[in-house]
């Protein structure tokens, strides 16, 4: 009988890849959450257009609390688990990223007290930075591109003094586009694999 001793090397690459595969299968590469987030940005854009930027700030903040539960629900509707295996260490990384993002919200809200549109541009930077960690969580380098696109968009929107409605539409379009790309990539890979 051969048992592994604590001195035997662990194949960390294989272990990480298994954890990433588990995350990908549970959340369709994270695509469902991105699409839900993009739809919340679109709803906020509508609120900004119909009512005010201040109400759109609250719509995005409150709506953002429902991204994960709505993503889980939609994942289950399309036949996915909508969750990851208990004990998957990447679940902890996802939670830590969420907590960091929540800790950044007061900064974005403070920006809105100066200029309402700065809130949305700040949020694009915050979520763009958060998506960078998703490259490790899901093992998909496309998240680096998503994070960079959101970050560059935030800077350009700020530089060109784009108002709230335009910033919200930009965030929505970027997230929905990337979310759909990731979803169809997930479907292709899982229908063929």
Feature-to-residue mapping (PLM):
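C-terminal ends of transmembrane helices
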Residues: 72-86, 129-136, 179-188
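Helix-coil boundary and interhelical linker segments in multi-pass alpha-helical membrane proteins
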Residues: 45-58, 108-118, 158-165
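N-terminal membrane topogenic signal
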Residues: 21-35
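Helix-adjacent hinge/juxtasegments
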Residues: 79-114
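Selected alpha-helical membrane-embedding segments in polytopic membrane proteins
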Residues: 37-92
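Terminal transmembrane helical module of multi-pass membrane proteins
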Residues: 143-193
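Short, Lys/Arg-rich, polar N-terminal cytosolic tail immediately upstream
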Residues: 1-25
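Membrane-proximal helix-loop-helix units in multi-pass membrane proteins
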Residues: 104-151
């Amino acid at each position: 009988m051969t048992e592994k001793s604590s001195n035997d090397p662990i194949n960390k690459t294989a272990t990480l890849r298994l954890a990433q595969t588990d995350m990908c299968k549970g959340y369709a590469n994270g695509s469902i959450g991105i699409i839900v987030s993009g739809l919340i940005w679109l709803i906020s854009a509508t609120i900004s257009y119909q009512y005010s930027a201040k109400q759109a700030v609250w719509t995005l903040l409150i709506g953002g609390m429902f991204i994960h539960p709505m993503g889980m629900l939609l994942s289950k509707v399309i036949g996915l688990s909508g969750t990851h295996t208990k004990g998957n260490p990447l679940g902890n990384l996802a939670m830590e990223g969420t907590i960091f993002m929540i800790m950044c919200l007061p900064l974005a809200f403070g920006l809105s007290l100066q200029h309402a549109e700065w809130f949305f541009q700040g949020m694009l930077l915050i979520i763009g930075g958060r998506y960078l960690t998703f490259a490790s969580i899901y093992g998909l380098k496309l998240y680096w591109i998503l994070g960079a696109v959101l970050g560059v968009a935030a800077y350009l929107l700020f530089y060109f003094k784009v108002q709230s409605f335009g910033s919200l539409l930009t965030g929505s379009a970027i997230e929905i586009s990337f979310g759909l790309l990731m979803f169809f990539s997930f479907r292709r890979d899982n229908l063929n694999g």
